[in-house]
C-alpha cells in the first residue's frame, strides 16, 4: 500500500505553517491512516491549506453555504471505499484517486485556541476528518457524528503528533 499525497498551500496562509518542514510527516500520517483503514490498494490524495476567503467561496459553490468552514472534502468516487468493486483495487502503478481535502488554516487557528491545543494538532485533526469523508464516512445525525469522531480519535492515536517543535509550527502574529 502506498499514498501519493499532493500538498498545496495558499500563499496567504504560508506564515501560519511551514508546510515544507512537515511535508514528510503528512505523507507518513496519511500512509499510517490508510494502512489502518484500507490495506490493499495504492491511493492518491490532494491536501490544500487555505484561508477563510477561499474556503468560503468553495463552501458557497459546492455546499450552498456562504460562510467559511474548517474543512471540505471532495471525494472522487461515489462508492464507499470499503465496498469498492474488485476492478478499482488500485494496482501498484495505478493509485486510486480519493479526492481533495481543503482546510482553512485561519479557522484552524481559532478552533485550536478555543480547544486548547496547537494549530498543527487542529490541522491534523481536520485532515483526518476530511480523509474519513473521502472514504465515505458522513455525519448527518448525532450518532453518526459520534462514530466519526471516535474514528478520528483512533486515527490520531496511531501517529505521534507530539513530536512537533516550535520551529515546525509558526507562531501567530499575536504570539510573537
Region annotations inferred by a language model:
Residues 1-124, 135-176:
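An acidic/histidine-cluster motif and surrounding catalytic segment
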Residues 132:
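Conserved ATP-binding N-box helix of the HATPase_c
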Amino acid at each position: 500500500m502506498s499514498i501519493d499525497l499532493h500538498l498545496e498551500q495558499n500563499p496567504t496562509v504560508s506564515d501560519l505553517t511551514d508546510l515544507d518542514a512537515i511535508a514528510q510527516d503528512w505523507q507518513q500520517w496519511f500512509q499510517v491512516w490508510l494502512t489502518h483503514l484500507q490495506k490493499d490498494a495504492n491511493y492518491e490524495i490532494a491536501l490544500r491549506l487555505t484561508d477563510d476567503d477561499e474556503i468560503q467561496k468553495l463552501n458557497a459553490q459546492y455546499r450552498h453555504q456562504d460562510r467559511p468552514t474548517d474543512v471540505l472534502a471532495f471525494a472522487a468516487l461515489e462508492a464507499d471505499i470499503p465496498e469498492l468493486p474488485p476492478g478499482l483495487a488500485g494496482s501498484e502503478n495505478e493509485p486510486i484517486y480519493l479526492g481533495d481535502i481543503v482546510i482553512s488554516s485561519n479557522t484552524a487557528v481559532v478552533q485550536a485556541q478555543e480547544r486548547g491545543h496547537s494549530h498543527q494538532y487542529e490541522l491534523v485533526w481536520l485532515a483526518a476528518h476530511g480523509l474519513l469523508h473521502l472514504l465515505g464516512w458522513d455525519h448527518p445525525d448525532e450518532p453518526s457524528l459520534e462514530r466519526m469522531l471516535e474514528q478520528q480519535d483512533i486515527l490520531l492515536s496511531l501517529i505521534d503528533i507530539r513530536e512537533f517543535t516550535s520551529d515546525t509550527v509558526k507562531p501567530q502574529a499575536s504570539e510573537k
